[in-house]
């Protein structure tokens, strides 16, 4: 008999090894990491990396083809009247927008949430439309409404009411009023939707029990509505603060760089002016870092005052 030739036998991967990666992919331990990976990657690429880069740039003098380390020179250069004017304008603008964009949307949301109001969807749509309007278009509309001519809409109304016309665009006080009014007009609808969403989560049984106990409207508002709206209120407060410190478009479309008494100069506008218009990238980066710190501090203070750091017991 001829000997039987045998070849090299290669081991076939076991089913367990073949399904190893599949089991890891579908395992409960890996699922949280897989779902959070897109957010973590986007956070690292679009948030953390730019912050680190800007922080490094704030200690440098950046010129075309030349980068030199200057230490704290960019930060010490912030000690000037123009920077303090921009900081004060930003704080004042943020304060007045908070005064408008927190209580007014809350009251309007309660009004729209009432069953007695007809055509609620029409009102909701009408209030949300300004948020979809381009800032440039909104700025042009406001420049026409509040023009310096007596024939402008705002001055025509004042004349009919017996008041003298105002030079809205060239006065510091009316200039701040215009910026706050423009921001309030644009973002009022969004805050209303936030509060409306919060009102939908308030149990109706609590209001019914309060009616049985004889509670009036104010007591129901203070002891039922407000406590349940606290998370939404804190969120709206936080994004409104951040939006206030980020303000640039409203001022730019109204005056560009020629606002009366520099009333339209904000921290973001000052950053744009120094970093891009004057090509002082290092100095602009220092302004950006200071802006980030101010936003973090103010946001933490607002969260602390609202009691968000207290443990629920």
Curated annotation (Swiss-Prot):
Result for mutant: residue 213 to A: Severely impairs the uptake of arabinotriose. Shows a 3.6-fold increase of the doubling time
CDD domains given in the database record: TM_PBP2
Induction note: Transcription is repressed by glucose and by the binding of AraR to the operon promoter. L-arabinose acts as an inducer by inhibiting the binding of AraR to the DNA, thus allowing expression of the gene.
Pfam families: BPD_transp_1
Transmembrane residue ranges: 39-59, 91-111, 126-146, 176-196, 224-244, 281-301
GO CC terms of this entry: plasma membrane
Cellular location(s): Cell membrane
Nucleotide-binding listed as a keyword: no
ABC transmembrane type-1 domain mapped to chain residues: 87-302
SUPFAM superfamilies cross-referenced by the UniProt entry: MetI-like (SSF161098)
Known partners and oligomeric status: The complex is composed of two ATP-binding proteins (MsmX), two transmembrane proteins (AraP and AraQ) and a solute-binding protein (AraN).
Family listed: Belongs to the binding-protein-dependent transport system permease family. MalFG subfamily.
PANTHER family tied to this protein: ARABINOOLIGOSACCHARIDES TRANSPORT SYSTEM PERMEASE PROTEIN ARAP, BLL4140 PROTEIN
Function of the molecule: Part of the ABC transporter complex AraNPQ involved in the uptake of arabinooligosaccharides. Transports alpha-1,5-arabinooligosaccharides, at least up to four L-arabinosyl units. Responsible for the translocation of the substrate across the membrane.
Designated name of the protein: Arabinooligosaccharides transport system permease protein AraP
